[in-house]
């Protein structure tokens, strides 16, 4: 009888606790934690086109927070905007980072369309893109949202795709309106504008929302500027106002956060309801005004002009700067991580997205305000190198660097930026070369990226998404010697 070698015991699956945010990369995005919005990874693929911003399964409240294009992920819940096509909504968690569309009460949604819950459906905000670009901040693309639920205005869909062109488009792309109040919000400029557009433009306002629509998100090469609404995530009863860029959510809506204009950007207004955000930015770096009673929806203030600006700015110009459009999506009750993004080529601190809950639970990274060209921390530094940190404990955690900034031709950061060179980090970056890290970038190849981010760019890789509680890190660092992992 021949001797048989004993097979080694298989390795156990590595995962995080139920409150942890998601791992995974390359298109899939990781599973969300308990309050997490799930991974908002966006697949890159060879053409980058139609790369959905959806990701793994969400947690208990995170279900269906992905904005996947084609096939439609998640189903709309009673008060969620979602359903059909590339629905995003579902549960209380709402969207992951990047161009996720919020759902449930969160409304946040980060990059692309924001909406969900009472604010009217984001929907149709899959990060589809052109033939070669990842579409970057395209909203819509490939089908649109199924439509409205009881209190939802139904969003995007139809012709309101924001896909980029074959030249790498990125940036806002076309209009991403939709819904009763939406429509007409032109996001994005010509020839790959990248940072010129917002990542999503206005999401349609819901039944009780004034929201979205109307606000121009820049255009051409100069990008935002003025009232570059970017992704107006009007939500709730207060609605979001044309140039509002914040991702309001739940009942409060994003009405409070206005978009700064001019070359200096400027900070936005505060949040509308209870959970006000502490603004550390201001000036050219923009402040982080967040909105949302139940959740914040990404940053708010939108810088304009050439200096980009802070917050989830939809602004930015040829010089890049914090032209991100929505930071991390507001997830669950905690709102999004990340926060505003530093503007200008020198970056700057930006504001750290903080609410009563995220400030208590944020752990990845540790309330780092960073800024500068390398970004880091909750702040997403602007400038060409982008950077940007992950979300907090309960943030939806998707979108790579949770609302990275960047944009312009040099890319950098994630955000809605992404010019010819695309952008790294989170957000809806993209461009001809795609963006590494999270976001809805795509580029020529897919590729990974840690955390909930989804890669893009030729080499993949990129920054990781928001992670969960520290136990998640401990789990990843431990290596039990008793398991033969060969």
Curated annotation (Swiss-Prot):
Tissue: Expressed in the epidermis of the ear (at protein level).
Compositional bias segments (type: Gly residues): 451-468
Molecular function (Gene Ontology), one example: structural constituent of cytoskeleton
Superkingdom of origin organism: Eukaryota
Disordered: annotated span: 451-486
Keyword Transferase: no
GO process annotations (BP): keratinization
Record keywords, A-Z: Disulfide bond, Keratinization, Repeat
The keyword Oxidoreductase appears for this protein: no
Other remarks on this protein: Transgenic mice expressing a C-terminal truncated form of loricrin exhibited, at birth, erythrokeratoderma with an epidermal barrier dysfunction. 4 days after birth, high-expressing transgenic animals showed a generalized scaling of the skin, as well as a constricting band encircling the tail and, by day 7, a thickening of the footpads. Transgenic mice also showed retention of nuclei in the stratum corneum. The mutant loricrin protein is found in the nucleus and cytoplasm of epidermal keratinocytes, but is not detect in the cornified cell envelope.
Record's function text: Major keratinocyte cell envelope protein.
Protein name listed in UniProt: Loricrin
Native source organism of the sequence: Mus musculus
């Amino acid at each position: 009888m021949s001797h048989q070698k004993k097979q080694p015991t298989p390795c156990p699956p590595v995962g995080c606790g139920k409150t942890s945010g998601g791992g995974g990369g390359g298109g899939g995005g990781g599973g969300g934690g308990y309050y997490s919005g799930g991974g908002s990874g966006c697949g890159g693929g060879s053409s980058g086109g139609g790369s959905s911003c959806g990701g793994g399964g969400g947690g208990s409240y995170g279900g269906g927070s992905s904005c996947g294009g084609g096939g439609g992920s998640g189903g709309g819940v009673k008060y969620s905007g979602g359903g059909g096509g590339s629905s995003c909504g579902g549960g209380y968690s709402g969207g992951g980072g990047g161009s996720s569309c919020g759902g449930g009460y969160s409304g946040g949604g980060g990059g692309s369309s924001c909406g969900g819950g009472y604010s009217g459906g984001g929907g149709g905000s899959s990060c589809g893109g052109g033939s070669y670009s990842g579409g970057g901040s395209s909203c819509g693309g490939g089908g649109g949202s199924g439509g409205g639920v009881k209190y939802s205005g139904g969003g995007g869909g139809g012709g309101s795709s924001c896909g980029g062109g074959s030249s790498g488009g990125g940036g806002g792309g076309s209009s991403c309106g939709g819904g009763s109040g939406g429509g007409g919000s032109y996001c994005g400029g010509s020839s790959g504008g990248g940072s010129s557009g917002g990542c999503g433009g206005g999401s349609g306002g819901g039944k009780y929302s004034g929201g979205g629509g109307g606000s121009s998100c820049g255009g051409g090469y100069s990008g935002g500027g003025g009232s570059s609404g970017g992704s107006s995530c009007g939500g709730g009863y207060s609605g979001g106002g044309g140039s509002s860029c914040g991702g309001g959510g739940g009942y409060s809506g994003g009405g409070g956060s206005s978009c700064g204009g001019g070359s200096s950007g400027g900070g936005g207004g505060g949040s509308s309801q209870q959970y006000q955000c502490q603004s550390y930015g201001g000036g050219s770096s923009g402040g982080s005004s967040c909105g949302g009673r139940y959740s914040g929806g990404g940053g708010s203030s939108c810088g304009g002009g050439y200096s980009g600006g802070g917050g989830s700015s939809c602004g930015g110009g040829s010089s890049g700067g914090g032209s991100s459009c929505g930071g991390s999506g507001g997830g669950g009750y905690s709102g999004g991580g990340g926060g505003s993004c530093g503007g200008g080529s020198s970056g700057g601190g930006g504001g750290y997205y903080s609410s009563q809950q995220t400030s208590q639970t944020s752990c990845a990274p540790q309330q780092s305000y960073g800024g500068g060209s390398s970004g880091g921390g909750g702040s997403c530094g602007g400038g060409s190198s982008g950077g940007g940190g992950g979300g907090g404990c309960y943030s939806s955690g998707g979108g790579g660097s949770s609302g990275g900034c960047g944009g312009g031709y040099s890319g950098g950061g994630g955000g809605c930026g992404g010019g010819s060179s695309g952008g790294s980090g989170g957000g809806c970056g993209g461009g001809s070369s795609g963006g590494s890290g999270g976001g809805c970038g795509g580029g020529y190849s897919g590729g990974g990226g840690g955390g909930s981010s989804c890669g893009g760019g030729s080499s993949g890789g990129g920054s990781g998404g928001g992670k969960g509680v520290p136990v998640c890190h401990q789990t990843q660092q431990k290596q039990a010697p008793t398991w033969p992992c060969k």
